[in-house]
């Protein structure tokens, strides 16, 4: 059993999503007491899928989740990219055993709720407090006062804001606003037995076309296939982040695409329409007693499928540094930002660029992209991403 130190300041984690629970699990593994404050009364059973690349899967294995992932996730055998109209293959990246051999962990496909449940199982009872919506944090030299929506307050020695792109703590530390990417996405789930020819072997499928793309993959043992159908949408009400939609709306946006795309979207029982926001990847989110993690620190568009993966890296690095720190957490928090900022800036930049490349209209630039893809999508070319080792101190 991990020994919990009584000499370090107690840490408050704001937000009980993937980022917050991974921060908590990593801190507890490092012997640091923490409490997670979650605004929801109960955790929702969210249906969306997550791609867990080897850079985060290795960390989850170290946290003790290898068995849970093998039970609840699916190992992807490949990533395939196809043309929008005729489904012609553009590239195929082999994963499977090659991925494990090259990067030390599989490439997992999992339902978000299953990953969340697995992380929650790592935490002792009482670590997560529900109905605790943090609205403000006031830092002093000797601690932080947290203010909650119900009028109550709590004291903590260190605060980690892992409360997503709407982060209240980020508003205090940075003060910027989310940026609409110009893209929206229809997400849905389909029974896998409706699409037997597409997913006989578990894989991630992309279809690229003018002003849009579709991503799809099976998620774990549920017999379901997740899809995200992204379209260029220059206008969106900034006050509305998501809304229920109908599969017919998504199908209309992809009229004329390959029959596999039409079949995939048409087989969904329901869809949800989301606007995709990010922020510019700036620093300044760590002080002497407060910092951010995950989307609160560096929200990014999902075109490298790295949002959750980068949050998991954040959690491991932060806990590693705090575990090696003395009573004063300030140097560790500032070092955490120094280490993470170059990494997330690169992932953030490449994610934005990939979104533009995915949506090229048919023409010379699209043809150049397509010709280059078979050599640009090799497994070794992802060493910068999947091979990154997020362990600055190595104390664990």
UniProtKB/Swiss-Prot annotation:
Pathway(s) the chain acts in: Antibiotic biosynthesis
Gene behind this protein: PtnB3
Role played: Part of a gene cluster involved in the biosynthesis of thioplatencin (ThioPTN) and platencin (PTN), potent and selective inhibitors of bacterial and mammalian fatty acid synthases. Catalyzes the hydroxylation of 3-amino-4-hydroxybenzoate (3,4-AHBA) to 3-amino-2,4-dihydroxybenzoate (3,2,4-ADHBA).
Keyword NADP on entry: yes
Entries under InterPro entries matching the protein: FAD-bd, FAD-dep_Monooxygenase_BioMet, FAD/NAD-bd_sf
Pfam families reported for this sequence: FAD_binding_3 (PF01494)
Lineage: Bacteria, Bacillati, Actinomycetota, Actinomycetes, Kitasatosporales
Signal peptide: none
Family: Belongs to the 6-hydroxynicotinate 3-monooxygenase family.
Active site, per annotation: 217
Keywords of this entry: Antibiotic biosynthesis, FAD, Flavoprotein, Monooxygenase, NADP, Oxidoreductase
Organism the protein comes from: Streptomyces platensis
Protein name as catalogued: 3-amino-4-hydroxybenzoate 2-monooxygenase PtnB3
The EC number(s) this enzyme carries: 1.14.13.249
Top-level taxon in the UniProt lineage: Bacteria
């Amino acid at each position: 059993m991990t020994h919990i130190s009584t000499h370090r300041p107690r840490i408050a984690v704001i937000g009980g999503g993937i980022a917050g629970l991974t921060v908590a699990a990593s801190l507890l593994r490092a012997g640091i007491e923490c409490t997670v404050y979650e605004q929801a009364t109960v955790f929702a059973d969210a249906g969306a899928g997550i791609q867990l690349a080897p850079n985060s899967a290795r960390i989850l294995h170290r946290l003790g989740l290898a068995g849970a992932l093998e039970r609840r996730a699916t190992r992807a055998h490949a990533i395939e990219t196809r043309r929008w109209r005729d489904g012609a293959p553009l590239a195929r990246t082999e994963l499977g055993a090659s991925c494990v051999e090259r990067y030390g962990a599989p490439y997992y496909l999992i339902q978000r709720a299953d990953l969340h449940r697995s992380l929650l199982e790592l935490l002792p009872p009482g670590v997560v407090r529900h109905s605790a919506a943090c609205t403000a944090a006031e830092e002093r030299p000797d601690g932080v006062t947290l203010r909650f929506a119900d009028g109550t307050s709590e004291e903590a020695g260190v605060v980690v804001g892992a409360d997503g792109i709407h982060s209240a703590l980020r508003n205090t530390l940075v003060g910027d606003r989310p940026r609409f990417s110009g893209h929206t996405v229809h997400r849905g789930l389909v029974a896998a037995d409706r699409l037997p020819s597409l997913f006989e072997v578990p894989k991630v499928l992309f279809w690229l076309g003018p002003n849009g793309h579709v991503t799809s993959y099976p998620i774990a043992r549920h017999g379901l296939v997740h899809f995200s159908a992204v379209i260029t949408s220059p206008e969106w009400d900034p006050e509305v982040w998501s809304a229920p939609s109908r599969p017919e709306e998504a199908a209309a946006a992809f009229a004329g695409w390959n029959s596999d795309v039409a079949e995939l979207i048409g087989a969904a029982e329901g869809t949800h329409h989301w606007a995709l926001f990010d922020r510019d990847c700036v620093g300044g989110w760590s002080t002497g007693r407060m910092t951010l993690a995950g989307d609160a620190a560096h929200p990014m568009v999902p075109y490298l499928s790295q949002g959750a993966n980068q949050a998991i890296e954040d959690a491991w690095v932060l806990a590693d540094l705090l575990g090696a720190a003395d009573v004063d957490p300030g140097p560790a928090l500032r070092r955490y930002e120094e280490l993470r900022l170059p990494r997330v800036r690169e992932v953030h930049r490449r994610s934005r660029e990939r979104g533009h490349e995915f949506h090229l209209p048919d023409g010379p630039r699209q043809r150049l992209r397509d010709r280059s893809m078979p050599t640009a999508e090799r497994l070794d070319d992802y060493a910068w991403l999947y091979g990154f080792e997020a362990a600055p101190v190595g104390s664990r």
